[in-house]
Curated annotation (Swiss-Prot):
It comes from the Bacteria. Substrate binds at N8, W9, K10, G171, S210, G231, G232. Its main location: cytoplasm. NCBIfam families: tim (TIGR00419). One of its GO terms (biological process) is glycolytic process. This is Triosephosphate isomerase. It is found in: Cytoplasm. Its EC number is 5.3.1.1.
Length: 253
């Protein structure tokens, strides 16, 4: 299966640094049949990034509102996302859930706004350290996915990318063990298999949580890991390109 390598730039960068970053990422060498690339800049820089990256690199937004156009000051609608030429959308990132109190219902409502568009949704799920240590991992992940799995058709679900990001490993330098990552991805796939086995086999489940060049090969080689959602390491073109290179090599072997 083609690996999907995505960079979440979060609220970082300025016009100068982003131009340098785009220039660096444009130099990445990879087979597009084996690896797909996408980046998520801050919304004010999206048009700049689209114009500065090769067409083969997807560009996405980090968030939208679940409202339609109208009197919602400061928000960005699904229609606007399509209008500016975005390819991807992050939904339900742990920082949105924890800092802005986004609920599973909010995540579903945002997904529902774009599921029948050309945009590829990347739905983020993950547990806290307390959840894992108290044995609630499976319950938490199943709950986060329940509205989506119960209300979307198999055809709609096939458009979704799922990003598993253990909250305790994001930006902390702490990485889940290879066994933890594989077991969790396998569990997520088992939830999808209850809906449709073919869907479970073909859907992309990517890992996010302190993924960087030095651990990319081991993580991306796991059988149920179809790519990565990279945070800090995606702000350095050389390191992001090395992760892309590792993914390309894995798909060549």
């Amino acid at each position: 299966m083609q690996k999907l390598i995505m960079g979440n730039w979060k609220m970082n960068g300025n016009s100068t640094s982003i131009k340098e970053l785009c220039s660096g990422i444009s130099q990445a060498q990879y087979d597009t049949s084996r690896v797909a690339i996408a980046v998520f800049p801050s919304s004010v820089y999206v048009k700049e990034v689209i114009s500065q990256l090769p067409e083969k690199v997807g560009v996405g937004l980090q968030n939208i509102t679940f409202y339609d156009d109208g009197a919602y000051t400061g928000e960005i609608s699904a229609r606007m996302l399509e209008d500016i030429g975005c390819d991807y959308l992050l939904i339900g990132h742990s920082e949105r859930r924890s800092l802005f109190a986004e609920s599973d219902e909010d995540v579903f409502k945002k997904l529902n706004k774009i599921i029948d568009t050309t945009i590829t949704p990347v739905v983020c799920i993950g547990e806290s350290l307390d959840d894992r240590q108290s044995g609630k991992l499976k319950q938490v992940l199943a709950t986060q996915l329940s509205l989506i799995l119960e209300n979307l058709s198999v055809e709609q679900l096939a458009k979704v990318v799922i990003a598993y990001e253990p909250v305790w490993a994001i930006g902390t330098g702490v990485v889940a063990s290879l066994d933890q990552i594989q077991e969790t991805h396998q569990f997520i796939r088992s939830l999808l298999a209850k809906v449709d086995e073919r869907l479970a086999k073909n859907i992309k489940i990517v890992y996010g949580g302190s993924l960087k060049a030095e651990n990319a090969k081991d993580i991306l080689s796991l059988p149920d890991v179809d790519g990565g959602l990279i945070g800090g390491a995606s702000l350095k073109a050389a390191e992001f390109n090395e992760i892309i290179n590792q993914a390309n090599k894995i798909c060549t072997e």
